[in-house]
């Protein structure tokens, strides 16, 4: 998987006809962050930040995943979402 394919997928996911489920969006978020930043480098958000905690958890689950593996999973998921929701 190339950086260009990853960037194309990141752009395409913004143009889906229907918004993916929260679970699908957390998958996308976690893999995007792992591919672009690497292992999580922030503290878990506070008790009342439910969205922030969910996003943090999705990214934290990928700790140790290589950039290439995260990019590949991200691209594959975007392709799946394009078939499911249209673009």
From Swiss-Prot:
The modification N-acetylserine is found at residue 2. The modification N6-malonyllysine is found at residue 55. InterPro entries: Acyl-CoA-binding_prot_CS, Acyl-CoA-binding_protein, Acyl-CoA-binding_sf, FERM/acyl-CoA-bd_prot_sf. The keyword rRNA-binding does not apply. Pfam families: ACBP (PF00887). Keywords: Acetylation, Endoplasmic reticulum, Golgi apparatus, Hydroxylation, Lipid-binding, Phosphoprotein, Transport. Isoform 1 is ubiquitous, with a moderate expression level. Isoform 2 is ubiquitous with high level in liver and adipose tissue. Isoform 3 is ubiquitous with strong expression in adipose tissue and heart. The modification N6-(2-hydroxyisobutyryl)lysine is found at residue 55. GO terms for biological process: fatty acid metabolic process; negative regulation of protein lipidation; phosphatidylcholine acyl-chain remodeling; positive regulation of CoA-transferase activity; positive regulation of phospholipid transport. The modification N6-succinyllysine is found at residues 8, 17, 55, 77. GO terms for molecular function: benzodiazepine receptor binding; fatty-acyl-CoA binding; identical protein binding; long-chain fatty acyl-CoA binding. It is found in: Endoplasmic reticulum; Golgi apparatus. Belongs to the ACBP family. Monomer. This is Acyl-CoA-binding protein. It comes from Homo sapiens.
């Amino acid at each position: 998987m190339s950086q260009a394919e990853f960037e194309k997928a990141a752009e395409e996911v913004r143009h889906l006809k229907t918004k993916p489920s929260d679970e699908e969006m957390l998958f996308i978020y976690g893999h995007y962050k792992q591919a672009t930043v690497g292992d999580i480098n922030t503290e878990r958000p506070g008790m009342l930040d439910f969205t922030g905690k969910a996003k943090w958890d999705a990214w934290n689950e990928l700790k140790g995943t290589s950039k290439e593996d995260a990019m590949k999973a991200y691209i594959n998921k975007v392709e799946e979402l394009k078939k499911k929701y249209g673009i």
